[in-house]
Amino acid sequence: MIDFPIKYRLIKKEKYTGARLGEIITPHGTFPTPMFMPVGTQATVKTQSPEELQQMGSGIILANTYHLWLRPGDELIAKAGGLHKFMNWDQAILTDSGGFQVYSLAEKRDISEEGVTFKNHLNGSKMFLSPEKAISVQNNLGSDIMMSFDECPQFYQPYDYVKKSIERTSRWAERGLKAHRRPHDQGLFGIVQGAGFEDLRRQSSHDLVSMDFPGYSIGGLAVGETHEEMNAVLDFTVPLLPENKPRYLMGVGAPDSLIDGVIRGVDMYDCVLPTRIARNGTCMTSNGRLVVKNAAYAEDFSPIDPECDCYTCKNYTRAYVRHLLKADETFGIRLTSYHNLYFLVNLMAKVRQAIVDDNLLEFRQDFIEKYGYNASNRNF
């Protein structure tokens, strides 16, 4: 049996759902699951220091392979001693494969069996990313958890296109495994694709599980499908994945989607949502989203969320944070970003406790009622 550098330990299953409490052991420490991972696109979580992330309970963060490959370059980061030393973060790091950014950011993509040729979005130069190159870059970055190179087809692509795509992604996964130079200290995850097609998700899962990765990611969701469609895909995909390995739902950060993913047995999540909306003054609170820049809060001297015990809510008022944002002061974005990240990391801590108490469905109902989900804030 292979001794993987990434190990999943199941602690408890929730009595009434597929939720599971566990922990993931990595070369840079152990973190509890289910866990939300803050995204540090450019080797930094926007406006936050590593110490602040540790204080809020983030045992793992995500960094983007595509961005770091282009700037400052994976070889420079390797010279610095790897990503952990480069950014002074001593806990776990997960890197994506770069594939999603190639499809979403780069211009003039050309996908072939060999890989993807594209135009660099920074300077317009022609570049090529293959399964082997994606692994090589991540080996240089030195992340604890790496991703296989995959194609992320749009959710509503035609069946025939998605079928060809997942079959190529499986071949790319095999090539990536062969190219992996550091299997002893970096765990490589396979990414299950298949859009909304159950048989294609089954085919993709079967292919990847047969390759015996140390963990599995569910890709191709949170790309425009409805909340109900996402849940349906999870309902038929998660049971196809091994129980003794981590399950990671990529790119998901809306609070109800996190809880619904946990109910279906998912362990890990990431999303830029909390920091992206924070820059526009939108805050997640126990009673739903709050746009603190609105004039209604100009003389509101209460915390952003009276039920939150984060640094922002313990020390500053809505009126002050609004003033900072209106004055274009960076500190305002730091405060809203910290609050939103804390909100999701803390939400996962509450979810873990609900699993311990076997009352996750009750917790979900209470949360959804208070958060006030409706058509206008479904994605927040």
UniProtKB/Swiss-Prot annotation:
Any single biological process term in GO: tRNA-guanine transglycosylation
Region (RNA binding): 251-257, 275-279
Positions annotated to bind substrate: 96-100, 150, 193, 220
Catalysed reaction, written as an equation: 7-aminomethyl-7-carbaguanine + guanosine(34) in tRNA = 7-aminomethyl-7-carbaguanosine(34) in tRNA + guanine
Task of the protein: Catalyzes the base-exchange of a guanine (G) residue with the queuine precursor 7-aminomethyl-7-deazaguanine (PreQ1) at position 34 (anticodon wobble position) in tRNAs with GU(N) anticodons (tRNA-Asp, -Asn, -His and -Tyr). Catalysis occurs through a double-displacement mechanism. The nucleophile active site attacks the C1' of nucleotide 34 to detach the guanine base from the RNA, forming a covalent enzyme-RNA intermediate. The proton acceptor active site deprotonates the incoming PreQ1, allowing a nucleophilic attack on the C1' of the ribose to form the product.
Alphabetical UniProt keywords: Glycosyltransferase, Metal-binding, Queuosine biosynthesis, Transferase, tRNA processing, Zinc
Annotated protein name in UniProt: Queuine tRNA-ribosyltransferase
Recorded family membership: Belongs to the queuine tRNA-ribosyltransferase family.
Cofactor dependence: Zn(2+)
Pathway: tRNA modification; tRNA-queuosine biosynthesis
One Pfam family this sequence matches: TGT
Quaternary structure and partners: Homodimer. Within each dimer, one monomer is responsible for RNA recognition and catalysis, while the other monomer binds to the replacement base PreQ1.
InterPro entries: ArchSynthase1/Queuine_TRR, TGT, TGT-like_sf, tRNA_ribo_trans-like
Active site residues of this protein: 96 (proton acceptor), 270 (nucleophile)
GO molecular function, one term: metal ion binding
Annotated coiled-coil segments of the chain: none
Cofactor note: Binds 1 zinc ion per subunit.
Entry keyword Zinc: yes
Gene Ontology CC annotations of this record: cytosol
Residue sites binding Zn(2+) per the record: 308, 310, 313, 339
EC number(s) per entry: 2.4.2.29
